[in-house]
Swiss-Prot record:
<dbReference type="InterPro" id="IPR018846">
    <property type="entry name" value="Beta-prop_RSE1/DDB1/CPSF1_1st"/>
</dbReference>
<dbReference type="Pfam" id="PF10433">
    <property type="entry name" value="Beta-prop_RSE1_1st"/>
</dbReference>
<dbReference type="GO" id="GO:0005634">
    <property type="term" value="C:nucleus"/>
</dbReference>
<comment type="subunit">
    <text>Identified in the spliceosome C complex. Component of the U11/U12 snRNPs that are part of the U12-type spliceosome. Component of splicing factor SF3B complex.</text>
</comment>
<feature type="compositionally biased region" description="Acidic residues">
    <location>
        <begin position="834"/>
        <end position="845"/>
    </location>
</feature>
<dbReference type="InterPro" id="IPR036322">
    <property type="entry name" value="WD40_repeat_dom_sf"/>
</dbReference>
<keyword id="KW-0539">Nucleus</keyword>
<dbReference type="Pfam" id="PF03178">
    <property type="entry name" value="CPSF_A"/>
</dbReference>
<dbReference type="Pfam" id="PF23726">
    <property type="entry name" value="Beta-prop_RSE1_2nd"/>
</dbReference>
<dbReference type="GO" id="GO:0048481">
    <property type="term" value="P:plant ovule development"/>
</dbReference>
<dbReference type="InterPro" id="IPR011044">
    <property type="entry name" value="Quino_amine_DH_bsu"/>
</dbReference>
<dbReference type="GO" id="GO:0009846">
    <property type="term" value="P:pollen germination"/>
</dbReference>
<protein>
    <recommendedName>
        <fullName>Spliceosome-associated protein 130 A</fullName>
    </recommendedName>
</protein>
<dbReference type="GO" id="GO:0055046">
    <property type="term" value="P:microgametogenesis"/>
</dbReference>
<dbReference type="InterPro" id="IPR015943">
    <property type="entry name" value="WD40/YVTN_repeat-like_dom_sf"/>
</dbReference>
<dbReference type="InterPro" id="IPR004871">
    <property type="entry name" value="Cleavage/polyA-sp_fac_asu_C"/>
</dbReference>
<dbReference type="InterPro" id="IPR050358">
    <property type="entry name" value="RSE1/DDB1/CFT1/CPSF1"/>
</dbReference>
Length: 1214
């Protein structure tokens, strides 16, 4: 079995982010690392975040830093990764790629303790970079320029110190003196030698300055000073002419200014009034904003509070350090302050935010200062504050993030054409159920009812130079309605259009004339109001029409074509007639090329299943140039001019290709390339769009031509980042559409469906899925589907939080203390997770501020029944008494009295530290009442461990409780034990069943295949895995095969050999006698590993599903970082050979950007086996054209054929 691995949605979580001028000029961009992906983002003029470039590096990005050489105009990016190499990247604006400027090897690959890459720090003047490991090793590279002004890099200079842990690293701004780097370090050499543990408890962190002597080319430890043992982060303080130099040390509860030869200046970080005394305050991210006359720091704590830190200094001497409350935003892994007045927050969990500065915190607020620091017997006097609504910042955009994706199921609850992906995401108050649909999201601008069922709609401008459309023209079966576009859309009668007949086409002709084609003729309306009519000869009528701005072709009944052109005066002149062999099914004329008077090509679709290209040149007018046979009669034709598939912003610098798109009556879109010179057709591709014949329309998206295909659902064909995408729109079925442009909606679409006129616009391009968000209360853990009622049951739990009632009581208390009424200036009983907007009236929205923190051993949990069709919670049971839900399943017991029941595994008083401990475990049994919309507790059964896995099995309940697999039956007051097996190695975390087989996943020992013998009432293991895997997800594939994922980012399949499987099924004891003997301290039989692949991210859920109507199934997976991928089985040996060779050539010709070897990356823990990396193969279109041809020649193909194979492989999955 060979599989094709493809990422459907890239990771959405962000590990780290930096900002700078990477493209040169004044524009500021943000470079973000999403695990194995490097993205370049830029806020547009509307304050929306746009992705400029995205690249898969096939390695783990651990750290990023930017630097600029003195006098240069753009920034470079230094990447610390798991490749054992330092890589310096430069963004190439013309080609829209990252160019690798330097790559220097210094150590082994992989994320290791002593191999640098975890920390990267640069000298603020761009003269040197230090790359550090968690322990021991630090290397310094000197950066310079050669005679041609290109960046050069020196050999590495070592700054190693053994037995030393590094916590943070940063450059020190010392102007143009020798570069200095600062590190927080801890020497553990004594602690290592002392068995009593006293030296470990006395170990002291130090702040160490490393100086690079540019004259001697040598690094030395210049200064080391003890620092607070809670120190975790360093921030560079501007130096030279801009400030006092030195560093800010962020420690638990404190911010300390430190510099060589300067006394420490310390201020406490203000803490929330409701924070338990046992909890400290740690800084998790920081940013500095520097202007010519001043600078300040923004630091964010682990609770999301942002503080403004300022230094009062005179020259190099700092007299006071102030920490003032600024605002509260969700906790971020990185924050970036842009010069345009934006703050980008890369959230740890949930959506990322772009904020605009309203003010910079000059108004009085809660402030702590080094000058009023008070020391008491318990320590320093804390300063308290109460979070408030945003005052200095306002959120203007957010980027969706699924991180962390906790559970995922592919279901078609809404009975749509394609299934939906239901995913549990987020953490705490930012948790959500997200319903993902393949396709682009749209924003509906207006819907209005029409007096009847319209058949078509067009928009027209009055003049070619107009920016916006003037009229919407709607055709009915016996009339035409004209609406003018202004402040209001209203009907007009003086437009010159004939309104007593249906219309076949409405368009602008020439520079300022309008044309209406109706069954009996052509109406030409001049700018001055004069109207010219052309009537059809005899009793024949016009059936089809094709047109552009200067040319019109009509097809009369019987198959006669008549060709018109607009002359110099704007008058329509008949040029040529041509008799076709039969009726014409559809027509289209190619757009007029820039600077030309006419287009050369006319496409004609006939009912004999052919499409012909005819010439419109005066020399050979209406002569057939080429013929294409298609699988069904064409319904609609569209010429689309698109740019080449590589290049700068959307390939703008490359010559256009002309594509002919045909919508066929069997629901297929047929796409073929038209030779711009000869009109010959080549490189055809087809894709099934839906059950209705696709109608094709040309619209404008981001200023470029795009194609709207209306089948049983709408599709959009468009260019994004140099590639052509054909993606469904998440909208209802439409009948007819036209581009729409007004001052309120510059790039919209007007469409008709049923008796309604709809205007909408397309949101973000390039997305695979769009999402509907349903907020949840606590961190979701797992969910199940009620099979008959189509309701979802979700279990949620959080550690160290208060229940909803306790939070409500505390909130009221807080309002009363603040002198506000019970509802504050909003509503205290506002929806449970504070809605999605900071603008809501609630001054303490949980979504923004997080939940108040409780003691770490306190748990809150709830069971939610949710109707996904209405997104409403029909039942919410909050668990009491410190219980947390861990597992859930639906179960039908032999006793049919209650029907489908719900089993929930919970644990009371769970503690992980200092050692794992719990009071008791329970299995709750609930019955569904009120049509499944509510739950009623039948009983709960106490068990001795944590029930992490539950599963129905032959009318009973299987439970994994610690290392015990137990079978329960339903009793009146509790569950009744029927049978158990205690021989599992550690902890059971998953159970799946098929017939009489049970597939058990152990937390650290992979899969165990079990059987239940009903006659002996015994559970026994007949096969297990010989590789100890730390399971995070599992799925049953077939009778002998299981798919699993481990916590190191691998996906693997194991299969019981066919002969063993048959032997066990035929054996009257079912392998039981062999089991009693055992083998290698385990089961008598071992499963074979048949598939192995390193995804590079921890997979949390696996499922077998098909995303395409009637398509074959794939294994879908979701990861912690929020990416969604699929593994699809090849059906032919030819495909395996082709993609294997393509992958081999891509490895050779396109080495990963950050220096990791692709083969080694995909085999990071176990050698890759029988999986082809589709993500690498899909980099093929980004290669230069000569390289594409070289690879294609070696594969005996053309580049177009390879692109077609890649497109087909993706279309089989989604």
């Amino acid at each position: 079995m060979y599989l094709y691995s493809l990422t459907l949605q890239q990771a959405t979580g962000i590990v780290c982010a930096i900002n700078g001028n990477f493209s040169g000029g004044k524009t500021q961009e943000i470079a973000v690392a999403r695990g194995k992906i490097l993205d370049l983002l830029r806020p547009d003029e509307n304050g929306k975040i746009q992705t400029i470039h995205s690249v898969e590096v096939f390695g783990a990005i651990r750290s990023l830093a930017q630097f600029r050489l003195t006098g240069a105009q753009k920034d470079y990016i230094v990447v610390g990764s798991d490749s054992g190499r330092i890589v310096i990247l430069e963004y190439n604006k013309e080609k829209n790629v990252f160019d690798k400027v330097h790559q220097e090897t210094f150590g082994k690959s992989g994320c290791r303790r002593i191999v640098p890459g975890q920390y990267v720090a640069v000298d603020p003047k761009g003269r040197a970079v230090m790359i550090g490991a968690c322990e021991k090793q630090k290397l310094v590279y000197v950066l310079n320029r050669d005679t041609t002004a290109r960046l050069t890099i020196s050999s590495p200079l070592e700054a190693h110190k053994s037995h030393t842990i590094c916590y943070s690293l940063c450059g020190v701004d010392c102007g143009f003196d020798n570069p200095i780097f600062a590190a927080i370090e801890l020497d553990y050499s004594e602690a290592d030698q002392d068995p009593t543990g006293q030296a470990a408890s006395e170990a002291q962190k130090h702040l160490t300055f490393y100086e690079l002597d540019l004259g001697l080319n040598h690094v030395s430890r210049k200064w080391s000073n003890p620092v607070d043992n809670g120190a975790n982060m360093l921030v560079t303080v501007p130096g030279g002419a801009d400030g006092p130099s030195g560093v800010l040390v962020c420690a638990e509860n404190f911010v300390i200014y430190m510099n060589q030869g300067h006394p420490d200046v310390r201020a406490v970080i203000p803490r929330r009034t409701d924070l338990p005394a046992e909890r400290g305050v740690l800084v998790v991210s920081a940013a500095v904003h520097k202007q010519k006359t001043m600078f300040f720091f923004l630091i964010q704590t682990e609770y999301g509070d942002v503080f403004k830190v300022t230094l009062d200094h005179n020259g190099d001497h700092v007299s006071e350090l102030k920490v003032k409350y600024f605002d509260t935003i969700p906790v971020a892994s990185s924050i970036c302050v842009l010069k345009l007045g934006f703050l980008f927050s890369a959230s740890e969990f949930g959506n990322h935010g772009l904020y605009q500065f309203q003010a910079i915190g000059e108004e009085p607020d809660v402030e702590s200062s080094s000058s009023n620091l008070m020391e008491t017997e318990e320590g320093f006097q804390p300063v308290f504050f109460q979070p408030r609504r945003l005052k200095n910042l306002v959120r203007i955009d957010q980027v969706e993030s699924l991180m962390p994706l906790m559970d995922m199921k592919v279901l078609n609850i809404f009975e749509e054409e394609t299934p939906q992906i239901f995913s549990l995401c987020g953490r705490g108050p930012r948790s959500s159920l997200r319903i993902l649909r393949p396709g682009l999201a749209i924003t509906e601008m207006a819907v209005s009812q029409l007096p009847g069922q319209p058949s078509a709609v067009w928009t027209v401008k009055k003049n070619v130079s107009d920016e916006f459309d003037a009229y919407i023209v709607v055709s009915f079966t016996n009339a035409t309605l004209v609406l003018s576009i202004g402040e209001q859309v209203e009907e007009v009668n003086d437009s010159g259009f004939l309104d007593t007949t249906p219309s076949l086409a409405v368009s602008l002709i020439g520079d300022d004339s309008l044309m209406q084609v109706h069954p009996n003729g052509i109406r030409h309306i001049r700018e001055d109001g004069r109207i010219n009519e052309w009537r059809t000869p005899g009793k024949r009528s016009i059936v089809k029409v094709g047109y552009n701005r200067l040319q019109v072709v009509i097809a009369l009944s019987g198959g006669e074509l008549i060709y018109f052109e607009a002359d110099m005066t704007g008058q329509l002149m008949e040029v040529e007639k041509h008799e076709m062999s039969g009726d014409v099914a559809c027509l289209d004329i190619a757009p007029v090329p820039e600077g030309r008077k006419r287009s050369r090509f006319l496409a004609v679709g006939s009912y004999d299943n052919t499409v012909r290209i005819l010439s419109l040149d005066p020399d050979d007018c209406l002569q057939i140039l080429s013929v294409q046979s298609v699988s069904s009669a064409p319904e609609s034709l569209l010429f689309l001019e698109v740019q080449a598939s590589i290049g700068g912003d959307d390939g703008a610098d490359h010559p256009a290709n002309l594509f002919l798109n045909s919508g066929l009556q069997n629901g297929v879109l047929f796409r073929t390339v038209v030779d711009m010179v000869t009109g010959q057709l080549s490189d055809s591709r087809s894709r099934f769009l839906g059950l209705k014949p696709p109608k094709l329309f040309s619209i404008s998206v981001r200023g470029r031509s795009a194609m709207l295909c209306l089948s049983s659902r709408p599709w959009l064909g468009y260019i994004h980042r140099g590639h052509f995408h054909l993606t469904p729109l998440s909208y209802e079925t439409l009948e007819f559409a036209a581009p729409f442009s007004s001052d309120q909606c510059a790039e919209g679409v007007v469409s008709v469906a049923g008796d309604a006129l709809r205007i909408f616009m397309i949101d973000r391009l390039g997305e695979t899925f769009n999402e509907t968000v349903v907020p949840l209360r606590y961190t979701p853990r797992k969910f199940v589907l009620h099979p008959k009622r189509k309701l979802l049951v979700i279990i949620e739990s959080d550690q160290g939080a208060f229940t909803a009632e306790e939070r409500e009581a505390a909130r009221k208390e807080c309002f009363e203390a603040g002198g506000v009424g019970e509802n504050g200036n909003g509503n205290a009983d506002q929806m449970e997770n504070g809605a999605d907007d900071e603008d809501k009236e609630d001054p303490l929205s949980d979504e923004q501020y997080g939940y108040p923190k409780a003691e770490s051993e306190k748990w809150v949990s709830c069971i939610r029944v949710l109707d996904p069709k209405t997104a409403t919670t029909t039942c919410l049971l909050e668990l009491q008494d410190n219980e947390a839900a861990y597992s859930v399943c639906t179960v039908n017991f032999h006793d049919k009295e209650y029907g489908t029941l719900l089993a929930v595994g919970t644990v009371k008083g769970m503690q992980f530290w200092p050692k794992k401990n719990l009071v008791a475990g329970f299995i709750h049994i609930y019955r569904f009442v009120e049509d499944g919309k509510s739950l009623e507790l039948l009983h709960k059964t106490q068990v001795e461990g944590v029930p992490l896995a539950l599963c129905q099995f032959q009318g009973r309940l299987l439970a994994g409780i610690g290392p015990v697999l137990r079978l329960y039956d339903l009793g009146k007051k509790r569950l009744l034990r029927k049978c158990e097996n205690k021989l599992f190695p550690n902890t059971i975390i998953s159970i799946q069943t098929y017939r009489d087989r049970i597939y058990v996943g152990d937390i650290q020992e992979s899969f165990h295949y079990c059987k239940y013998r009903r006659d002996e009432n015994q559970l026994y293991i007949f096969a297990d895995d010989c590789v100890p895997r730390w399971l995070t997800a599992s799925h049953h594939v077939d009778f002998d095969t299981m798919a699993g994922a481990d916590k190191f980012g691998n996906v693997y399949f194991v299969r019981l050999p066919q002969d063993l499987s048959e032997e066990i099924e035929e054996d009257p004891t079912g392998g039981k006698i062999k089991w009693e003997q055992g083998k290698l301290n385990g089961a008598p039989n071992k499963v074979d590993e048949i598939v192995q692949f390193h995804v590079g991210d921890v997979v949390t859920c696996l499922q077998k599903a098909s995303m395409i109507p009637g398509g074959s199934e794939s294994i879908m997976y979701g990861t912690v970082m929020g990416s969604i991928g699929a593994l699809h089985a090849f059906t032919s040996r030819d495909d395996v050979d082709f993609f294997s060779h393509l992958e081999m050539h891509m490895r050779q010709e396109y080495p990963p950007l950050c220096g990791r070897d692709h083969m080694a990356y995909r085999s990071a823990y176990f050698p890759v086996k029988d999986v082809i990396d589709g993500d690498l193969c899909e980099q093929f279109p980004t290669l230069p054209m000569d390289l594409q041809r070289k690879i294609a020649d070696e594969l005996d193909r053309t580049p177009a054929e390879i692109l077609k194979k890649l497109e087909d492989a993706r279309n089989k999955i989604i």
